Amino acid sequence: MASIHPTAIIEPGAKIGKDVVIEPYVVIKATVTLCDNVVVKSYAYIDGNTTIGKGTTIWPSAMIGNKPQDLKYQGEKTYVTIGENCEIREFAIITSSTFEGTTVSIGNNCLIMPWAHVAHNCTIGNNVVLSNHAQLAGHVQVGDYAILGGMVGVHQFVRIGAHAMVGALSGIRRDVPPYTIGSGNPYQLAGINKVGLQRRQVPFATRLALIKAFKKIYRADGCFFESLEETLEEYGDIPEVKNFIEFCQSPSKRGIERSIDKQALEEESADKEGVLIES
């Protein structure tokens, strides 16, 4: 049975699932759906054609499903979908989409920290972390298990690959390949996200292949896309390397980030890589 505080405003038509908890002074508009076991804490505001998945918690003063911050929006019917077991923390803003029938989508088990902003037409995968004040412009795509540090700014239409780790205060203008780590404004790649992949129990051989593939691609003197093809021939039997290369080869409105932190790469010898990965 749902628990709804008497000061909460629930418009007629809103769909409230089993065992939902709605705290004081929450506003839930008529076209919102809260699935089972959702918790909405005080002063949160949920609007639009928004669906919140099972077990997700919306923290105080978060705002979800509002009109997109896009002058092209003319009142079209658009959507927000948030998956299961997410944490949408204090003052986070997730706006609705812009074009008719389109959706802002957030996957399962995501953590959206305070003051983070997810703009119109964004797509976020599963197990993603947006740290405090991370800001996604419109049409950004974030892959599974990606982590964005505090106060990261992401340009519209950028893609951030799965398992990427973006350091705090970074400015992202181009697509960030999966499995990589980097930071800075302007952004620079610093190699493969070895620690993150190890924590997710990616096999040693796969991690080592990703490291070698990254260096082969980014240290090449010739054409970047020729290096991708050569690396695909050498390591293409490893799914993660194939994913990395296909991400870089796929259509992009912003282009692939090619700037690297040369010092960070030079500090890694082959022996050191092995020790870091296996430890």
From Swiss-Prot:
<keyword id="KW-0012">Acyltransferase</keyword>
<dbReference type="InterPro" id="IPR018357">
    <property type="entry name" value="Hexapep_transf_CS"/>
</dbReference>
<dbReference type="GO" id="GO:0009245">
    <property type="term" value="P:lipid A biosynthetic process"/>
</dbReference>
<dbReference type="Pfam" id="PF13720">
    <property type="entry name" value="Acetyltransf_11"/>
</dbReference>
<dbReference type="InterPro" id="IPR011004">
    <property type="entry name" value="Trimer_LpxA-like_sf"/>
</dbReference>
<keyword id="KW-0677">Repeat</keyword>
<comment type="function">
    <text>Involved in the biosynthesis of lipid A, a phosphorylated glycolipid that anchors the lipopolysaccharide to the outer membrane of the cell.</text>
</comment>
<dbReference type="Pfam" id="PF00132">
    <property type="entry name" value="Hexapep"/>
</dbReference>
<dbReference type="GO" id="GO:0016020">
    <property type="term" value="C:membrane"/>
</dbReference>
<dbReference type="InterPro" id="IPR037157">
    <property type="entry name" value="Acetyltransf_C_sf"/>
</dbReference>
<dbReference type="GO" id="GO:0005737">
    <property type="term" value="C:cytoplasm"/>
</dbReference>
<comment type="subunit">
    <text>Homotrimer.</text>
</comment>
<keyword id="KW-0808">Transferase</keyword>
<keyword id="KW-0441">Lipid A biosynthesis</keyword>
<dbReference type="InterPro" id="IPR010137">
    <property type="entry name" value="Lipid_A_LpxA"/>
</dbReference>
<dbReference type="InterPro" id="IPR029098">
    <property type="entry name" value="Acetyltransf_C"/>
</dbReference>
<comment type="pathway">
    <text>Glycolipid biosynthesis; lipid IV(A) biosynthesis; lipid IV(A) from (3R)-3-hydroxytetradecanoyl-[acyl-carrier-protein] and UDP-N-acetyl-alpha-D-glucosamine: step 1/6.</text>
</comment>
<keyword id="KW-0444">Lipid biosynthesis</keyword>
<keyword id="KW-0963">Cytoplasm</keyword>
<dbReference type="GO" id="GO:0008780">
    <property type="term" value="F:acyl-[acyl-carrier-protein]-UDP-N-acetylglucosamine O-acyltransferase activity"/>
</dbReference>
<comment type="similarity">
    <text>Belongs to the transferase hexapeptide repeat family. LpxA subfamily.</text>
</comment>
<keyword id="KW-0443">Lipid metabolism</keyword>
<protein>
    <recommendedName>
        <fullName>Acyl-[acyl-carrier-protein]--UDP-N-acetylglucosamine O-acyltransferase</fullName>
        <ecNumber>2.3.1.129</ecNumber>
    </recommendedName>
</protein>
<dbReference type="InterPro" id="IPR001451">
    <property type="entry name" value="Hexapep"/>
</dbReference>
